[in-house]
Structure formats: structure tokens, C-alpha cells
């Protein structure tokens, strides 16, 4: 149980949103004979993509905790529950072993996923996806870990958009259909925007502390007002992109996101209480694309 807090399980539903969107777009394009799990079709690829993504997300969470702890960024987060490493319930050596373990799981699930999709580990598409998988692992680890962690250089938002949005959606779509459409690209961008919003909300909350410890997030560069304008545009952009390709059911989320934005614009504290709101409404938006 002492490891559970460091896994940050509440982030996991958000991480699969792109897989849901990409898979939903791919399903109607696949022949019914490819819908069987036994034939390595839709459901096999979907489940393996989910497993790979969850492993990568937990890997990122663990590396993020270790990186922030080593840099001292999480040492003065008043009003927040301490994670395992910060509270002393687990050691640095234990969390490093967990990082290696989930990196290995990511490779295992990812390799099985690639073979299930292409029937070979050495075909050109397979090699491309191996390269993308390696980039995903590097991106998961180096967000806050290492001397040149991109999360400390204002590039975290771009990383989330690329990995949670474009790669997650387009990757799952291509693995299932072995083709690419503009709708898949646009929907990948669309679901990536509120995922960036989750990181932005986190960075607005931690803005003062991040500046003290030299963590230059995009939110800290924009300032409190600019970061809120940016946040608003992320959510509006998401809905506009989905509506552009006929996913009108996603507009049902407007009342919840309007409430979320009202809270963000009228509060400077307790922003952490809206982190689950944005995470689960983003997942809901992904599910609404299936309607």
C-alpha cells in the first residue's frame, strides 16, 4: 500500500483518453473479421494499447516524483498530500526499482502490441513504432528527471500534447487501420488540448513554488492571468476541433467546463480540487466521441 500514492492512480483515466478516441475512429473502418481478440484484431490491439499507455503513465509519474524530489521542488508544497518519496514511506532506491520495472512493462506490452498489429517486429511500420515507443519512454522519464529535464524548461505542455494527444490517438488509429486520416490528426490534437489543460492547472497551482525552485513552466512564463486565458483557449479549442469533424456530442461537456472555468477564474487557492474534475471530464469527452 505504501507504493500506491506514488503511482498517482487518479492520472490513469486521463492517459487512456487518446486511445479511446483513436480506437473509436478506427473501429468502423475495420472489417468485422478483425474485431476478434483471438485473431489479434481490434480488441487485442485496444487492450494492449491501454496496457502500454498505463505502464508509460505510471513510469512518468514515478520519474516525475523522483525528479522533483532530487531538485527539491516538492519540498515545500503546503496544503498538498506528500507523495511516498517526499513523506519517507519509500526510499529513492525503491522508486528507482519501480521506474525500471514499469519501463520493462512498457517495453513488453509495446512489443506485443506492435507484433499484434503488424504480425512482424521487423517490418518498416514496426520499426517506426519501436522508435516512437522509445521516444515515449524517454519523454516519460525526462520530464523532470535529469539535468536537462524539459518540464523545467517550459516544454511540458508540448510533451503532453504530443504524447497524450497526437501520438496516443494517431498511433492507436494507425495500429488498427494501417492508414491515416485528417480526422484522426484533428481529433488527436483535440483530445490533447484538455490533457495539456490538466498540466496547466497543476502548474498554475504550483506557480509560486516552481519559480522559487527554478522550474520554468509555461504557466509561470504566462503569469496568473495569461495562464488562465491559455487554459480557457485550450478547452474551447478542443470542442471546436471535435465539432469541426461532426463530434457534436462532445458539446454536452460545456456546462461542466463552464463551471470549471468559473472556478479557475474566481479562485486562487484549492485549485487541486478541480484536477479530478478536468481529468474525468476529459475522459468523458473522449467517450462522447464514440456516440
Placement of each model-derived feature along the sequence:
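Extended hydrophobic alpha-helices typical of membrane-associated regions
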Residues: 244-291
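Intramembrane alpha-helical segments
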Residues: 81-179
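Membrane-embedded alpha-helical segments that form the functional core of polytopic membrane enzymes
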Residues: 35-63, 128-141, 182-201
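Small-residue-rich segments of transmembrane alpha-helices in multi-pass membrane proteins
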Residues: 16-22, 158-173, 219-224, 275-291
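Topogenic membrane-insertion module of multi-pass membrane proteins
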Residues: 1-44, 48, 143-151, 160
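Multi-pass membrane catalytic core of lipid/isoprenoid biosynthesis enzymes
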Residues: 76-120, 215-246, 280
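Functional transmembrane core segments of multi-pass inner-membrane proteins
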Residues: 160-207, 225-226
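Acidic (Asp/Glu-rich) catalytic motifs at the cytosolic membrane interface
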Residues: 55-79, 196-219
Amino acid at each position: 500500500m505504501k507504493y500506491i500514492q506514488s503511482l498517482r492512480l487518479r492520472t490513469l483515466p486521463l492517459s487512456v483518453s487518446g486511445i479511446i478516441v483513436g480506437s473509436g475512429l478506427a473501429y468502423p473502418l475495420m472489417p468485422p473479421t478483425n474485431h476478434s481478440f483471438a485473431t489479434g484484431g481490434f480488441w487485442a490491439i485496444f487492450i494492449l494499447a491501454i496496457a502500454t499507455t498505463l505502464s508509460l503513465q505510471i513510469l512518468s509519474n514515478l520519474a516525475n516524483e523522483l525528479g522533483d524530489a532530487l531538485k527539491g521542488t516538492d519540498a515545500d508544497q503546503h496544503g498538498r498530500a506528500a507523495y511516498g518519496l517526499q513523506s519517507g514511506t519509500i526510499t529513492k532506491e525503491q522508486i528507482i526499482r519501480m521506474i525500471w520495472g514499469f519501463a520493462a512493462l512498457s517495453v513488453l506490452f509495446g512489443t506485443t502490441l506492435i507484433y499484434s498489429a503488424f504480425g512482424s517486429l521487423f517490418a518498416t511500420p514496426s520499426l517506426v513504432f519501436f522508435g516512437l515507443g522509445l521516444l515515449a519512454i524517454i519523454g516519460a522519464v525526462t520530464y523532470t528527471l535529469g539535468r536537462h529535464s524539459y518540464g523545467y524548461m517550459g516544454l511540458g505542455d508540448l510533451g503532453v500534447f504530443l504524447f497524450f494527444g497526437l501520438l496516443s490517438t494517431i498511433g492507436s488509429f494507425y495500429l488498427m487501420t494501417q492508414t491515416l486520416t485528417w480526422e484522426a490528426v484533428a481529433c488527436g490534437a483535440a483530445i490533447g488540448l484538455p490533457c495539456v489543460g490538466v498540466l496547466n492547472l497543476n502548474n498554475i497551482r504550483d506557480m509560486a513554488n516552481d519559480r522559487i525552485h527554478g522550474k520554468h513552466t509555461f504557466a509561470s512564463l504566462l503569469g496568473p492571468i495569461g495562464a488562465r486565458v491559455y487554459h480557457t483557449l485550450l478547452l474551447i479549442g478542443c470542442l471546436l476541433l471535435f465539432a469541426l469533424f461532426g463530434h457534436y456530442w462532445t458539446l454536452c461537456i460545456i456546462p461542466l467546463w463552464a463551471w470549471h472555468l468559473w472556478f479557475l477564474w474566481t479562485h486562487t487557492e484549492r485549485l487541486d480540487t478541480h484536477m479530478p474534475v478536468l481529468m474525468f471530464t476529459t475522459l468523458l469527452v473522449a467517450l462522447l466521441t464514440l456516440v
